[in-house]
Amino acid sequence: MARILLIGTDEALLEGLAQSLAAAGHSPQIATSVVEGLEMSAAEPPLLSVVPHSLALARPEVLHVLLSNGSALLLYRTLGGDTSPLPPRVQRLVLADLMLPLERHRLLALVQFVEHRARTTGRVLPEPPEPRAD
């Protein structure tokens, strides 16, 4: 079970993503502000942070703080949102730049991939097996 931090102001989109991630067995957390997201990240570092594309353009230093907490970064934008390209130094920090909600299946696949890599490299301890009812 991967801990995923969703940061943004589009509550409907984030709630839908959180439900999809929870249904896939992950532990999503929603932060509606940057400050709240940074506090949540510092308290319990997430495996992945999903951040709005506009935030990466406006405040790239936030990405460095999230990375320093050990989180991989995914950026998202919505239909009709900002389509300006990311500066090269920001591009190198992020795993993917997704168009949500259209690419929500790609988001789930990336979460599974990062979780698998974290388990393989020993970053995340495997969960103990469920006790069997005999």
Where are these regions (language model features)?
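Conserved phosphotransfer microenvironments
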Residues: 14, 34, 47-70, 78-87
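Two-component/phosphorelay signaling modules centered on CheY-like receiver
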Residues: 10-30
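CheY-like receiver
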Residues: 118-134
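Short alpha-helical segment
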Residues: 36-38
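C-terminal output helix
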Residues: 98, 102-112
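Conserved sequence signature across two-component system core domains
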Residues: 7-8, 31, 49
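Active-site charged/polar residues at nucleotide-handling catalytic sites that mediate phosphoryl
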Residues: 43-44
